[in-house]
Amino acid sequence: MNKTTDAAFRETVARHGDRPFLCVPSDPARGYHQDGYEIDYANAAGAVDELIARYRDAGYGHGHRVAVALENRPEHCLHKLALNALGISCVPINPDYRPAEIAYLLDHCEADLILHLDSNADSLRAAMSEISRDVPMIEASKFADGPPAAKRPAPIAGPVTPQSEASLLYTSGTTGRPKGCILSHQYELMSGAWYADLGGLMALEPGAERVYNPLPLYHVNSGIVSFFGMLLTGGCQ
C-alpha cells in the first residue's frame, strides 16, 4: 500500500463510480438525515473535490491539522478524504469529551482549524477559553462559504506521500490524559487492506458489500479500519 488515501480513493472511483459509498439508514428520531442518506463513489468524489477547493483556497495544506467534531455523520468521511488529499491531518473529537479534555486535545495537537456542528459550538468555545491558542472555527453547514484563512503557511513543503500524517486519533483518557496516535496514509490503507483480506465470514467481494458499523468515527475501527476496508473494495459503509 505504497500510495496515499486520495490515490486509493480515486482508483476505486474509477472502478466503482456508480456503487454506493456511504449510507445512513433512515431514522425519524435522529437529529440529522432523518430520511436516510446515500452517496455513490462518483458523487462523493465531486463533493470531496469541492471541499478540497475550499480548504486550499483558505490556505490549508500539507502538515496542517484540522480538528473535526462532526459526530457520526457521513460528512466526516468526506472531509477526511478532502483533508488527506491536501496532506492535512484529520483530528476527530470525541463528542463525549468534557471541555477540559477538548482543550487538552486542541492544545496538544496544535490544531489549525476546528470543523464543528452548531450543536457542539458552546462546548468547543468553553474549551477554547481554557487554552492560550486562538483556533479558527467553522460550522459545517456554512463550509460552502469557505473556512477562515489559515493562520500559518503549510508546515511541510512538497507532495503528500504514503508516510504523511493522515490522522491523529486520541484515546479515551480514562486512566490519564488522552494520548495522541499518529496514523500515516500507508498505515490507514494497510489497516483497511487487512480488514478486506480477512476472508471467511468477513470475505468482501469487490463492489458488492455493505457494512453496518455503529461504532464512532473518532475510533480506529469505524473511522479507519472498516472505512478503508470498504473503500478499497468498492463497498459501502
Residue ranges and their predicted role:
Residues 1-27, 46, 166:
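A short N-terminal helical cap/helix-turn-helix that marks the beginning
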Residues 2, 17-20, 151-170, 176-177, ...:
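Conserved pre-ATP/AMP-binding loop-to-beta segment of ANL
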Residues 22-73, 77-81, 98-103:
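Conserved AMP-binding/adenylate-forming core of the ANL superfamily
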Residues 26-37, 119-162, 177-178, 189:
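ANL superfamily adenylate-forming
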Residues 37-42, 166-193:
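Conserved AMP-binding A3 loop
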Residues 65, 71-91, 95-99, 108-113, ...:
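A short helix-loop-beta submotif of the ANL/AMP-binding
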Residues 97-127, 146-150, 191-212:
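Conserved ATP-dependent adenylate/AMP-binding module captured primarily in the ANL superfamily
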Residues 189-210, 218-237:
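Conserved AMP-binding/adenylation subdomain of ANL enzymes
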